[in-house]
Design a protein with these regions (language model features):
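Glycine-rich nucleophile elbow surrounding the catalytic serine of serine-hydrolase chemistry
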Residues: 176-187
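The conserved beta1-alpha1 loop
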Residues: 101-105, 178, 204
Length: 336
């Protein structure tokens, strides 16, 4: 009888949060697995998971940087924080700079980076620096999460080096990150400090294993002069609560037209697709909302504001939460 009681108590301890009471990001997280599925971890289990992952910290966390310009638009030139490395590249201090940071399981050659690079170079002369952080390709999501602060610090150090030794302007600098890459961008901004990074764009900043109530450990509005978030899979792979000073909610921010309601990856990736289109076409009209709950509920009226999602002028005029109507296929923006 005692054995049965013990087994019942053990089972109760394991199922700490009943299924019907699980709130993603509040009392636990649905953490992505390598096969695309999600596994629930309550707060205790998540803490144990992170502790196990931290036991392997100290291993290599290589971060490399590849420069693309009008002179080399398709073949990135690796640059290091060394005088000759930068001088032997096509880096031009008179051109604005864009850092692009991939998320979990990504590489610098991924289509996300290719599309964002092409989008900016189609606009004119830019230094587009694509970041490759090797620990992102870990099979275990948690081990990549553990690498985020270190990767972000290295990106921040590179930004400082280019600013201090090669005249890169911080006033025209934008750092763009997707998913986990958004938080790498946040740590880069924290490393540079004092909101000296001009703009950070968080493309559906990852939520699993990040707490909204701990902005010092995620991308936050304090990491740059202006932080913009484009939130497309809120409450699942991305945050639902506003991350940026300007927080944009395409289709209400949870699921995207043309994506299955169960295909979180599709909605998560749409943030990249929308951003590329915003850079090249500036066609995402927005409706200002009283708060993010109204944006999620699509209860913001029908009057378009003067703000365009993803516009590079937003830093000087945008604050608040915006609902963004979108189409189910390209062009996704509804403003011509």
């Amino acid at each position: 009888m005692k054995v049965i009681v013990c087994l019942v108590l053990l089972a109760a301890a394991v199922i700490a949060v009943p299924i019907e009471e699980r709130v993603n990001g509040e009392n636990g997280w649905f953490v992505p697995k390598d096969d695309g599925s999600l596994k629930w971890f309550d707060l205790r289990e998540a803490e144990e998971l992170m502790l196990r992952s931290s036991s392997v910290e100290g291993r290599a966390n290589d971060v490399t940087f590849y420069l693309y310009t009008k002179d080399n638009p398709t073949e990135g030139k690796e640059i290091r924080a060394e005088k000759t490395s930068v001088e032997d590249s096509h880096f031009n201090k008179n051109h604005a700079t864009r850092f692009v940071i991939h998320g979990w399981k990504g590489r610098y050659t991924d289509s996300m980076n290719v599309k964002i690079t092409k989008a900016w170079l189609s606009r004119g002369d830019y230094n587009v620096i694509v970041v490759n952080w090797a620990r992102a390709i870990s099979v275990e999501y948690a081990t990549s999460v553990m690498a985020v602060p270190g990767a972000g610090t290295k990106v921040g150090e590179m930004i400082k080096y280019l600013h201090e030794h090669h005249g890169m302007s911080l006033d025209t600098l934008e750092v763009i990150g997707h998913s986990l890459g958004s938080h790498v961008a946040g740590y880069a901004g924290k490393t540079v400090g004092d909101k000296r990074v001009h703009t950070i764009i968080g493309l559906d900043p990852a939520m699993p294993l990040f707490s909204y109530d701990q902005p010092s450990k995620r991308l936050s509005t304090e990491d740059a002069f202006y932080v913009e978030s484009i939130q497309t899979n809120g409450g699942r792979l991305g945050f639902l609560k506003p991350i940026g000073k300007g927080a944009f909610y395409p289709n209400g921010g949870k699921t995207q037209p043309g994506c299955s309601s169960t295909d979180n990856s599709c909605s998560h990736q749409r943030s990249v697709t929308y951003y590329v289109e915003a850079v090249t076409q500036d066609n995402f009209g927005t409706i200002k909302c009283r708060d993010y709950e109204a944006a999620v509920a699509k209860e913001c009226g029908s009057t378009y504001s003067s703000v365009r999602m993803g516009a590079d002028t937003n830093a000087y005029m945008v604050e608040g939460d915006f609902y963004v109507p979108v189409n189910d296929k390209a062009p996704f923006g509804k403003i011509e």
